[in-house]
């Protein structure tokens, strides 16, 4: 089963072609890691999956991003786009909790916008904090401001905020790049515990991280999809010489 079917996806920023005919299936309830050097199109690819690309006035797309049988790139109605983003959550590179809000209110924010009953909101908040491996650290201080948390805790709070919406897909754009090794490992453990429940697309520039957590890996270079395979196969037996060279430079010989 696939969560997304991407077909001949092209993205233009003005005259610059940022993605060049990407065709890729994202398997359902697995972790797909996206690797490649800076500027290769990894983040642009995520923006197409969550339709953030539509917020960029000078961006133009071609091709298809099929989700639940529909090409979501054709959505124009704001209600359809918002509904899609509820099903496809996103965690960004830099932790971005609302610092003026309490820990609890950060997680509850999107649910309140939906007009959900407060009793159900409370259940969802606790559920999301537990799934994000944060509940045991904050349960007795949910009224504290989010700014009181460490960087790693703030990122897990952002994961909880996304999970509270019960998304079918969670997109993660280099979510550990600002974190120390201990916080990074906790995020990785959280992500691996979530697979099986949620489809995860995880962008990373850290090849050891991709190897640790990915079920499948896609290698992007200069806006092209060079190769995609099971993570084990891609790292140990790459089929394209460009993949092999990149892995050997960044990760060591396979």
Curated annotation (Swiss-Prot):
GO terms for cellular component: plasma membrane. SUPFAM superfamilies: P-loop containing nucleoside triphosphate hydrolases (SSF52540). One of its GO terms (molecular function) is ATP hydrolysis activity. Pfam families: ABC_tran. Its EC number is 7.3.2.1. Part of the ABC transporter complex PstSACB involved in phosphate import. Responsible for energy coupling to the transport system. This is Phosphate import ATP-binding protein PstB.
């Amino acid at each position: 089963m696939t969560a997304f079917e991407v077909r001949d996806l092209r993205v233009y920023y003005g005259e610059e072609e940022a993605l060049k005919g990407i065709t890729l299936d994202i398997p359902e309830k697995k972790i797909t890691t996206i690797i490649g050097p800076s500027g290769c199109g990894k983040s642009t690819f995520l923006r197409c999956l969550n339709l953030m690309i539509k917020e960029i006035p000078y961006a133009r797309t071609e091709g298809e991003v099929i989700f639940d049988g529909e090409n979501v790139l054709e959505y124009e109605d704001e209600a359809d786009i918002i509904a899609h983003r509820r099903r496809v959550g996103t965690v960004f590179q830099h932790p971005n909790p609302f610092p003026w809000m309490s820990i609890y209110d950060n997680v509850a924010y999107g649910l309140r916008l939906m007009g959900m009953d407060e009793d159900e909101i409370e259940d969802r908040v606790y559920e999301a904090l537990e799934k994000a491996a944060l509940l045991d650290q904050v349960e007795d201080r949910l009224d504290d401001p989010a700014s009181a948390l460490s960087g790693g805790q703030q990122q897990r709070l952002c994961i909880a905020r996304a999970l509270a919406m019960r998304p079918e897909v969670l997109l993660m754009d280099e979510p550990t790049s600002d974190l120390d090794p201990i916080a990074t490992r906790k995020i990785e453990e959280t992500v691996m515990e979530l697979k099986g429940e949620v489809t995860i697309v995880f962008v990373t520039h850290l090849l050891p991280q991709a190897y640790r957590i990915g079920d499948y890996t896609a290698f992007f270079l200069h806006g092209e999809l060079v190769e995609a395979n099971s993570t084990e196969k891609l790292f140990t037996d790459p089929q394209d010489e460009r993949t092999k060279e990149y892995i050997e430079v960044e990760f060591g010989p396979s």
